[in-house]
Design a protein with these regions (language model features):
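Alpha-helical interface subdomain recognition
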Residues: 1-9, 17-19, 32-35, 74, ...
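Short Ser/Thr-interspersed hydrophobic loop/turn segments at strand-loop and sheet-helix junctions
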Residues: 2-8, 113-119, 145-149
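FAD-binding glycine-rich core of flavoenzymes that anchor FAD
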Residues: 4-13, 17, 28-57, 75-78
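Short glycine/proline-enriched turns and hinge-like loops at secondary-structure junctions
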Residues: 63-65, 91-96, 135-136
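A structural signal for short hydrophobic beta-strand segments in well-ordered beta-sheet cores
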Residues: 69-72
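A short core secondary-structure module
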Residues: 78-124
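Flexible, small-/acidic-enriched active-site or ligand-binding loops
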Residues: 118-150
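Long, acidic (Asp/Glu-rich), low-complexity accessory segments flanking structured domains
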Residues: 146-164
Length: 326
């Protein structure tokens, strides 16, 4: 839970800039890489190198099966030759290496990554993207032009990258849920302090029933997200990585969609409570303004809310007995 505490600094992209690669780019290497790859990364990634997860493309966000970046083996069969583009890649502008999702020659998704995978020196071009939430995250548009990576850096079996990606999404979305729940609790704290301090119509804001109603809704959303998060976290701590991938994808998807949806409602309520200060980038309402301006980003990371809700339902339906009926 150290990562969520960074949300309280008031800069949404600061935590992403520091830790995003470790949270979503490195786990596939440690969980699916060969022993040689893992040994190499355990030495080079200990505070010395940055790595990014490169999956999203201009034409494929939540639809990971629609990736157009290709990986073709070299004539000697020792390297992957990678061509394509990646978009909205967090930490991409300053990363040393990339964990890349691509399609192989047989049109099945494959995943390749390691310290030698696709480096900035391996025929790749980076462009910083101008987003509304923060430049501190180093979000990039990446072009791979005949970039090369050793075949030994493939994560998991060739053609089995879809399992690697989907299982990694669980951890990625869980971290987003941690951030969302903590940020909402931070907004509740700001609003409780402000409504106790601010006077309107000759008395504190929190003496007004309509304000207390908004506070009640904010607290209910924040605490329900936190409680659900702790339940899933307990299950994660008592399951193997493979069990998490097969049993928790649906619940985590539901929680992520729910928590970011709650976050948007909380942001809107917080602005109403702070009034003009809630849309001012400086002063007492600066945290509320920043949260309201950047909350939409959380709803898209790791899969759009509607896509995640559908994923959760499909996971539940898949586990139902074929003869289930009233």
């Amino acid at each position: 839970y150290r990562y969520p505490e960074l949300t309280l600094c008031g800069n949404r992209g600061y935590g992403d800039g520091l830790l995003s690669g470790m949270v979503i780019g490195l786990p596939p290497v440690l969980n699916f890489g060969s022993e040689e790859v893992k040994r190499k990364w355990s030495r080079s990634s200990a505070g010395k190198k940055f790595i990014s997860l490169a999956i999203s493309e201009a034409h494929a966000g939540s639809d990971v099966m629609g990736l157009q970046t290709t990986a073709v083996k070299s004539e000697d069969g020792k390297e992957w030759i990678i061509n394509g583009t990646k978009k909205w890649i967090t930490n991409g502008t300053f990363s040393d290496y990339f964990t890349v999702g691509c399609k192989t020659e047989d049109a099945l998704l494959s995943f390749s990554s390691s310290a030698d995978l696709v480096s900035k020196q391996s025929r790749s071009r980076l462009a910083c993207m101008d987003l509304q939430y923060s430049a501190a995250a180093g979000t990039a548009f990446i072009t791979f032009d005949n970039a090369r990576a050793p075949v030994g850096n493939t994560l998991g079996e060739e053609g089995g990258g879809i399992f690697v990606m989907l299982s990694n999404f669980n951890h990625e979305r869980w971290v987003m849920c941690c951030n969302s729940a903590r940020a909402q609790r931070g907004m509740v704290e700001e609003c409780l302090k402000w409504t106790n301090q601010r006077k309107a119509f000759g008395k504190p804001l929190n003496s007004l029933a309509i304000i207390r109603s908004k506070l009640a809704a904010m607290i209910s959303r924040a605490e329900s997200c936190q409680t659900w998060l702790e339940s899933i976290s307990y299950q994660m701590c008592n399951m193997s990585y493979k069990q998490q991938a097969s049993k928790l994808a649906g619940p985590i998807a539901f929680l992520k969609a729910y928590s970011t949806s709650c976050g948007q409602e909380t942001a809107a309520d917080a602005v109403q409570i702070f009034g003009g200060r809630g849309i001012t980038r400086t002063g007492m309402g600066r945290y509320v303004e920043h949260y309201h301006r950047t909350i939409a980003f959380d709803a898209l990371l790791g899969g759009a809310e509607d896509v995640l809700r559908d994923l959760g339902v499909r996971q539940a339906m898949r586990a139902m007995p074929a003869d289930a009926k009233l």
